Amino acid sequence: MESNDNQKTSGLTGQKLVIVESPTKARTISRFLGNDFQVLASMGHVRDLPDRRISVDPEDEFKAIYQITPTAKPVVNAIKAAAKNAPEIYLATDPDREGEAIAWHLLEAAEIKKPVQRVVFHSITENAVDEAFAHPREIDMRLVNAQFARRHIDRLIGYPTSNLLRRYVQKGSSAGRVQSPALRMVVEREEEIR
C-alpha cells in the first residue's frame, strides 16, 4: 500500500476515507482534499475469478465465484481497518465499467456495510475533484453488471477455447471475445487484398 501523509494518521476518528485505484492519484488527491481525508489506493482489482477454473455457472443465473487476489489481501485489510472509523467513505475508482466494478468489489471484499458514495472525475485537477465531491452518487450497478458480463464471457468462451487451441493447434495460442473477431476481420481483409 502506498504511503502518504494522510495515511500516517490512519484510524483517526473523523477522517473521511477516499479510495482510488493508483498510488499516484492517491497522493495528488490527498493534497487537494487536505487532512480531513485519508486517501488510500486499491492498486486496481482486488478480486478476480480463481485461476484454473471456469468459476461462472451459466446454469445458476451465471453466478460467479470471486476471490481476493493474493497481492490485494494487505490492501483490502488496510481499507477494512480504515473504513471502521471513517464517518464517510468515498469510492473514487476510475470512471468506467472496470472502475465501477472495482468499487463494488472493494465494498464486498472489505465487508463495508455502512453507506458509501461514489465520486467520479475525468481529470485529476482540484476543480474536477471538488466538482465530483459536490455531486456524489451511488455505484452504478448497470456498469458493474456490464463488466461482469464482459469478464464472464471471457471466462466462459475464451478460457475453454484457448485451452483447446493450446492443446490441438499451438502452445501459447489464445482466443477471446475481442481477439477472435479482430483476427477474423484481419483474415477477411487479407483475403480481399489477394
Residue spans of the language-model regions?
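C-terminal helical "lid" subdomain and adjoining coupling/linker elements of P-loop NTPases
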Residues: 164, 168-175, 186-194
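Short, hydrophobic/aliphatic alpha-helical segments
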Residues: 84, 158-169
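Intrinsically disordered, low-complexity regulatory segments
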Residues: 1-151, 160, 181
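Long, charge-dense, solvent-exposed interaction surfaces that engage phosphate-rich ligands
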Residues: 153, 177-178
